[in-house]
Amino acid sequence: GLFSVLGAVAKHVLPHVVPVIAEKL
């Protein structure tokens, strides 16, 4: 369903987004 797609996208994107946010903090 939609949530499974969002979950897959989140798992793919989060590892790239978290380091960027950490650097800005």
From Swiss-Prot:
Expressed by the skin dorsal glands. InterPro entries: Caerin_1 (IPR010000). Pfam families: Caerin_1. The keyword Secreted applies. Keywords: Amidation, Amphibian defense peptide, Antibiotic, Antimicrobial, Immunity, Innate immunity, Secreted. The modification Leucine amide is found at residue 25. One of its GO terms (biological process) is innate immune response. GO terms for cellular component: extracellular region. Contains two amphipathic alpha helix regions separated by a region of less-defined helicity and greater flexibility. Belongs to the frog skin active peptide (FSAP) family. Caerin subfamily. This is Caerin-1.6. It comes from Ranoidea chloris (Red-eyed tree frog).
